[in-house]
Amino acid sequence: FMTWGYKNKPTMYKKLKKEFLRAANLNNLLVIPAGEAFDLGNRSHPEINLYTSDNRHPSEEGTFLAASVVFATLFGRSTEGNSGIGNIEPSVAIKLQRIADKTVSEFFNIQLK
């Protein structure tokens, strides 16, 4: 599970990504690219706050995004339109699902079902 960098430390993510990929390659492990999704989400939808007030831990939206990435990675299926969105606004949920799907598709170079 590739984590994300802190909100106020923009260069942290690239270092984390490098080390997660190195460790996974050395040990033949699957990487769930949650950090990659956070990076894309922060760049493409900065209006969606993925962090709690400590700028480190995920907000409800960040948790939803990470869970969507886990689902798409493990099942190879799109998350778009999944109805289990909890307290997240539907318009925000669809954006986060699209971020998760795009991240997983590009990270693994696959087409989600």
Where do the language-model regions lie?
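Surface-exposed cleft-lining segments at the edges of enzyme active sites
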Residues: 1-9
